[in-house]
Amino acid sequence: MMKTLSSGNCTLNVPAKNSYRMVVLGASRVGKSSIVSRFLNGRFEDQYTPTIEDFHRKVYNIHGDMYQLDILDTSGNHPFPAMRRLSILTGDVFILVFSLDSRESFDEVKRLQKQILEVKSCLKNKTKEAAELPMVICGNKNDHSELCRQVPAMEAELLVSGDENCAYFEVSAKKNTNVNEMFYVLFSMAKLPHEMSPALHHKISVQYGDAFHPRPFCMRRTKVAGAYGMVSPFARRPSVNSDLKYIKAKVLREGQARERDKCSIQ
Protein backbone atom coordinates (compact mmCIF):
# COMPACT_ATOMS: atom_id res chain seq x y z
CA MET A 1 0.00 0.00 0.00
CA MET A 2 1.24 3.48 -0.88
CA LYS A 3 0.18 6.84 0.52
CA THR A 4 0.01 9.77 -1.90
CA LEU A 5 1.18 12.98 -0.26
CA SER A 6 0.85 15.54 -3.03
CA SER A 7 -0.23 15.90 -6.61
CA GLY A 8 1.00 17.76 -9.66
CA ASN A 9 4.31 17.36 -11.46
CA CYS A 10 5.71 15.30 -8.61
CA THR A 11 3.78 12.79 -6.54
CA LEU A 12 5.31 11.67 -3.26
CA ASN A 13 4.32 8.11 -2.44
CA VAL A 14 5.27 6.69 0.93
CA PRO A 15 4.92 2.96 1.68
CA ALA A 16 2.49 2.28 4.52
CA LYS A 17 5.25 0.43 6.36
CA ASN A 18 7.28 3.66 6.38
CA SER A 19 4.46 5.81 7.79
CA TYR A 20 4.52 6.58 11.51
CA ARG A 21 2.81 8.81 14.04
CA MET A 22 4.39 10.63 16.98
CA VAL A 23 2.00 11.69 19.74
CA VAL A 24 3.01 14.45 22.16
CA LEU A 25 1.09 14.49 25.45
CA GLY A 26 1.21 16.40 28.71
CA ALA A 27 -0.49 19.01 30.87
CA SER A 28 -1.12 22.57 29.70
CA ARG A 29 1.73 25.11 29.58
CA VAL A 30 4.56 22.58 29.84
CA GLY A 31 6.05 23.33 26.40
CA LYS A 32 4.65 20.57 24.17
CA SER A 33 4.10 22.88 21.20
CA SER A 34 7.51 24.51 21.74
CA ILE A 35 9.21 21.12 21.48
CA VAL A 36 7.21 20.32 18.33
CA SER A 37 8.20 23.70 16.88
CA ARG A 38 11.86 22.95 17.57
CA PHE A 39 11.46 19.61 15.81
CA LEU A 40 9.71 21.03 12.74
CA ASN A 41 11.49 24.32 12.10
CA GLY A 42 14.11 24.84 14.81
CA ARG A 43 12.30 27.85 16.27
CA PHE A 44 10.99 28.75 19.72
CA GLU A 45 7.82 30.78 20.09
CA ASP A 46 7.74 33.02 23.18
CA GLN A 47 4.02 33.71 22.96
CA TYR A 48 1.81 31.06 24.55
CA THR A 49 -1.22 29.93 22.56
CA PRO A 50 -3.38 27.18 24.11
CA THR A 51 -3.48 24.08 21.91
CA ILE A 52 -6.71 22.26 21.18
CA GLU A 53 -5.02 19.75 18.89
CA ASP A 54 -2.43 20.48 16.22
CA PHE A 55 -1.52 18.08 13.43
CA HIS A 56 1.71 18.24 11.43
CA ARG A 57 3.35 16.04 8.83
CA LYS A 58 6.97 15.70 7.83
CA VAL A 59 8.12 13.77 4.78
CA TYR A 60 11.64 12.40 4.43
CA ASN A 61 13.81 11.11 1.62
CA ILE A 62 16.53 9.09 3.32
CA HIS A 63 19.01 7.63 0.86
CA GLY A 64 16.22 7.33 -1.69
CA ASP A 65 13.64 5.74 0.64
CA MET A 66 10.52 7.73 1.48
CA TYR A 67 9.23 8.09 5.06
CA GLN A 68 6.32 9.96 6.60
CA LEU A 69 6.03 11.11 10.20
CA ASP A 70 2.73 12.55 11.43
CA ILE A 71 2.99 14.62 14.61
CA LEU A 72 -0.01 15.00 16.89
CA ASP A 73 0.36 17.86 19.39
CA THR A 74 -2.46 17.22 21.85
CA SER A 75 -4.37 19.47 24.21
CA GLY A 76 -3.35 19.56 27.84
CA ASN A 77 -6.98 19.76 28.92
CA HIS A 78 -8.14 16.57 27.13
CA PRO A 79 -11.81 17.70 26.91
CA PHE A 80 -12.71 14.66 24.79
CA PRO A 81 -11.53 11.41 26.46
CA ALA A 82 -12.57 9.30 23.45
CA MET A 83 -10.36 11.37 21.14
CA ARG A 84 -7.47 11.08 23.59
CA ARG A 85 -7.85 7.30 23.53
CA LEU A 86 -7.95 7.30 19.72
CA SER A 87 -4.81 9.44 19.61
CA ILE A 88 -3.02 6.92 21.81
CA LEU A 89 -4.20 3.97 19.72
CA THR A 90 -2.82 5.53 16.53
CA GLY A 91 0.52 6.48 18.08
CA ASP A 92 3.74 4.66 17.22
CA VAL A 93 6.11 6.76 19.35
CA PHE A 94 5.28 8.96 22.32
CA ILE A 95 6.69 12.02 24.05
CA LEU A 96 5.25 12.75 27.50
CA VAL A 97 6.14 16.28 28.57
CA PHE A 98 6.09 17.84 32.03
CA SER A 99 7.61 21.00 33.46
CA LEU A 100 10.42 20.56 35.95
CA ASP A 101 8.94 23.37 38.03
CA SER A 102 5.47 21.77 38.23
CA ARG A 103 4.73 18.74 40.39
CA GLU A 104 1.17 18.58 39.02
CA SER A 105 2.41 18.24 35.44
CA PHE A 106 4.69 15.38 36.50
CA ASP A 107 1.77 13.60 38.16
CA GLU A 108 -0.15 14.01 34.89
CA VAL A 109 2.69 12.33 32.98
CA LYS A 110 2.54 9.38 35.35
CA ARG A 111 -1.19 9.05 34.67
CA LEU A 112 -0.62 9.33 30.93
CA GLN A 113 2.08 6.67 30.94
CA LYS A 114 -0.25 4.27 32.72
CA GLN A 115 -3.11 5.08 30.34
CA ILE A 116 -0.93 4.51 27.26
CA LEU A 117 0.18 1.10 28.52
CA GLU A 118 -3.40 0.11 29.25
CA VAL A 119 -4.82 1.34 25.95
CA LYS A 120 -2.04 -0.07 23.77
CA SER A 121 -2.20 -3.43 25.53
CA CYS A 122 -5.59 -3.91 23.85
CA LEU A 123 -3.72 -4.19 20.55
CA LYS A 124 -1.30 -6.74 21.96
CA ASN A 125 -3.74 -9.50 22.92
CA LYS A 126 -4.30 -7.75 26.24
CA THR A 127 -0.82 -8.57 27.53
CA LYS A 128 0.99 -5.50 28.78
CA GLU A 129 4.32 -7.27 28.79
CA ALA A 130 4.05 -7.77 25.03
CA ALA A 131 3.72 -4.08 24.30
CA GLU A 132 6.91 -2.43 23.06
CA LEU A 133 6.23 1.30 23.12
CA PRO A 134 9.03 3.70 22.23
CA MET A 135 8.46 6.51 24.68
CA VAL A 136 10.36 9.50 26.06
CA ILE A 137 9.55 11.13 29.38
CA CYS A 138 10.58 14.74 28.87
CA GLY A 139 11.21 17.19 31.71
CA ASN A 140 11.10 20.60 30.02
CA LYS A 141 12.37 24.00 31.25
CA ASN A 142 15.70 22.85 32.64
CA ASP A 143 16.94 26.38 31.91
CA HIS A 144 15.05 27.56 35.01
CA SER A 145 16.80 27.92 38.34
CA GLU A 146 17.28 24.78 40.44
CA LEU A 147 15.41 26.64 43.17
CA CYS A 148 12.27 26.33 41.03
CA ARG A 149 12.62 22.58 40.51
CA GLN A 150 9.79 20.51 41.98
CA VAL A 151 10.66 17.14 40.41
CA PRO A 152 14.01 15.51 41.31
CA ALA A 153 15.77 13.81 38.40
CA MET A 154 16.04 10.53 40.31
CA GLU A 155 12.27 10.42 40.82
CA ALA A 156 11.59 11.00 37.13
CA GLU A 157 14.12 8.36 36.11
CA LEU A 158 12.15 5.76 38.07
CA LEU A 159 9.43 6.00 35.41
CA VAL A 160 11.77 4.57 32.79
CA SER A 161 13.89 2.19 34.87
CA GLY A 162 13.95 -1.36 33.55
CA ASP A 163 12.30 -0.46 30.24
CA GLU A 164 14.66 -0.40 27.26
CA ASN A 165 11.97 1.26 25.14
CA CYS A 166 11.59 4.23 27.46
CA ALA A 167 14.05 7.04 28.20
CA TYR A 168 14.13 10.18 30.32
CA PHE A 169 15.48 13.54 29.18
CA GLU A 170 15.65 16.96 30.76
CA VAL A 171 15.48 19.58 28.02
CA SER A 172 14.96 23.25 27.36
CA ALA A 173 12.85 24.01 24.31
CA LYS A 174 13.72 27.67 24.81
CA LYS A 175 17.49 27.15 24.79
CA ASN A 176 17.32 24.10 22.50
CA THR A 177 19.17 22.03 25.09
CA ASN A 178 19.08 18.22 24.67
CA VAL A 179 16.18 18.43 22.19
CA ASN A 180 18.05 16.90 19.24
CA GLU A 181 19.53 14.23 21.49
CA MET A 182 16.06 13.33 22.76
CA PHE A 183 14.67 12.79 19.27
CA TYR A 184 17.73 10.78 18.25
CA VAL A 185 17.22 8.35 21.13
CA LEU A 186 13.45 8.16 20.55
CA PHE A 187 13.88 7.21 16.89
CA SER A 188 16.63 4.75 17.79
CA MET A 189 14.33 2.98 20.26
CA ALA A 190 11.64 2.84 17.57
CA LYS A 191 14.17 1.41 15.08
CA LEU A 192 13.56 4.35 12.75
CA PRO A 193 16.31 5.99 10.68
CA HIS A 194 18.54 8.23 12.77
CA GLU A 195 18.31 10.77 9.96
CA MET A 196 14.75 11.60 11.01
CA SER A 197 16.29 13.54 13.91
CA PRO A 198 16.23 17.33 13.28
CA ALA A 199 20.00 17.75 13.19
CA LEU A 200 20.72 14.85 10.81
CA HIS A 201 19.00 15.81 7.56
CA HIS A 202 18.87 18.69 5.12
CA LYS A 203 15.69 20.73 5.47
CA ILE A 204 13.76 21.66 2.34
CA SER A 205 11.33 24.58 2.45
CA VAL A 206 8.28 24.54 0.20
CA GLN A 207 6.81 27.92 -0.67
CA TYR A 208 3.05 28.35 -0.85
CA GLY A 209 2.98 28.37 -4.65
CA ASP A 210 5.24 25.33 -4.91
CA ALA A 211 3.38 23.17 -2.41
CA PHE A 212 2.00 20.87 -5.09
CA HIS A 213 5.14 20.94 -7.21
CA PRO A 214 7.96 20.12 -4.78
CA ARG A 215 10.52 19.59 -7.55
CA PRO A 216 13.58 19.96 -5.29
CA PHE A 217 12.27 17.05 -3.21
CA CYS A 218 11.55 14.93 -6.29
CA MET A 219 15.01 15.50 -7.67
CA ARG A 220 16.38 13.67 -4.62
CA ARG A 221 14.25 10.56 -5.04
CA THR A 222 17.12 8.62 -6.56
CA LYS A 223 19.45 6.54 -4.41
CA VAL A 224 21.76 9.25 -3.12
CA ALA A 225 23.94 9.48 -0.06
CA GLY A 226 21.87 12.00 1.82
CA ALA A 227 18.79 12.67 3.91
CA TYR A 228 16.20 15.39 3.31
CA GLY A 229 13.10 16.45 5.21
CA MET A 230 10.15 18.62 4.23
CA VAL A 231 7.29 19.86 6.42
CA SER A 232 3.99 19.42 4.58
CA PRO A 233 2.33 22.88 4.36
CA PHE A 234 -1.26 21.61 4.10
CA ALA A 235 -1.30 18.69 6.54
CA ARG A 236 -4.77 17.88 7.83
CA ARG A 237 -5.78 15.66 10.72
CA PRO A 238 -7.15 12.37 9.32
CA SER A 239 -10.79 11.61 10.01
CA VAL A 240 -11.86 9.24 12.78
CA ASN A 241 -12.72 6.65 10.14
CA SER A 242 -9.25 6.97 8.60
CA ASP A 243 -7.66 6.58 12.03
CA LEU A 244 -9.66 3.42 12.70
CA LYS A 245 -8.55 1.97 9.36
CA TYR A 246 -4.97 2.94 10.20
CA ILE A 247 -5.17 1.07 13.51
CA LYS A 248 -6.65 -2.01 11.84
CA ALA A 249 -3.96 -2.06 9.15
CA LYS A 250 -1.21 -1.61 11.73
CA VAL A 251 -2.47 -4.49 13.88
CA LEU A 252 -2.67 -6.68 10.78
CA ARG A 253 0.92 -5.85 9.78
CA GLU A 254 2.19 -6.53 13.30
CA GLY A 255 0.36 -9.87 13.36
CA GLN A 256 1.88 -10.87 10.04
CA ALA A 257 5.33 -9.88 11.27
CA ARG A 258 4.92 -12.04 14.39
CA GLU A 259 3.86 -15.00 12.25
CA ARG A 260 6.93 -14.58 10.05
CA ASP A 261 9.13 -14.47 13.14
CA LYS A 262 7.56 -17.69 14.44
CA CYS A 263 8.15 -19.43 11.12
CA SER A 264 11.78 -18.34 10.99
CA ILE A 265 12.38 -19.60 14.55
CA GLN A 266 10.79 -22.96 13.81
UniProtKB/Swiss-Prot annotation:
Sequence motif: Effector region, positions: 48-56
What is annotated about its quaternary structure and interactions? Monomer (Potential). Interacts with GNB1, GNB2 and GNB3. Interacts with PIK3CA and UBE2I.
Q: Which GO terms describe its cellular component?
A: plasma membrane; synapse
Please give the tissue specificity annotation from the record for this chain.
Prominently expressed in the striatum, weakly in the cerebral cortex and the CA fields of the hippocampus. Highly expressed in the hippocampus and cerebellum, only during the postnatal period. Also expressed in pancreatic endocrine cells (islets of Langerhans), adrenal gland and stomach and in a thyroid cell line.
Q: Where is the lipid attached (S-farnesyl cysteine)?
A: C263
* GO BP annotation list: locomotory behavior; negative regulation of protein ubiquitination; positive regulation of phosphatidylinositol 3-kinase/protein kinase B signal transduction; positive regulation of protein sumoylation; signal transduction; synaptic transmission, dopaminergic
List every stretch annotated Interaction with GNB1, GNB2 and GNB3. Answer: 189-235
Which SUPFAM superfamilies does the entry mention? P-loop containing nucleoside triphosphate hydrolases (SSF52540)
One Pfam family in the UniProt entry: Ras
Q: Which gene encodes it?
A: Rasd2
Primary role:
GTPase signaling protein that binds to and hydrolyzes GTP. Regulates signaling pathways involving G-proteins-coupled receptor and heterotrimeric proteins such as GNB1, GNB2 and GNB3. May be involved in selected striatal competencies, mainly locomotor activity and motor coordination.
Family per record = Belongs to the small GTPase superfamily. RasD family.
| Modification sites for Cysteine methyl ester | C263
What subcellular locations does the record give? Cell membrane
Q: Which Gene Ontology MF annotations are present? A: G-protein beta-subunit binding; GTP binding; GTPase activity; phosphatidylinositol 3-kinase binding; ubiquitin conjugating enzyme binding
Transmembrane stretches in the record are none
Q: What Gene3D superfamilies does this protein's entry cite?
A: P-loop containing nucleotide triphosphate hydrolases
Expression induction or repression: By thyroid hormone, efaroxan and glibenclamide.
Which positions bind GTP?
Answer: 26-33, 73-77, 140-143
User: Is Nucleotide-binding there in the keyword field?
Assistant: yes
Superkingdom of source: Eukaryota
**Which residues are propeptide?**
264-266
This protein's name: GTP-binding protein Rhes
Keywords from UniProt, A to Z, are: Cell membrane, GTP-binding, Lipoprotein, Membrane, Methylation, Nucleotide-binding, Prenylation
Q: Which PROSITE patterns match?
A: RAS
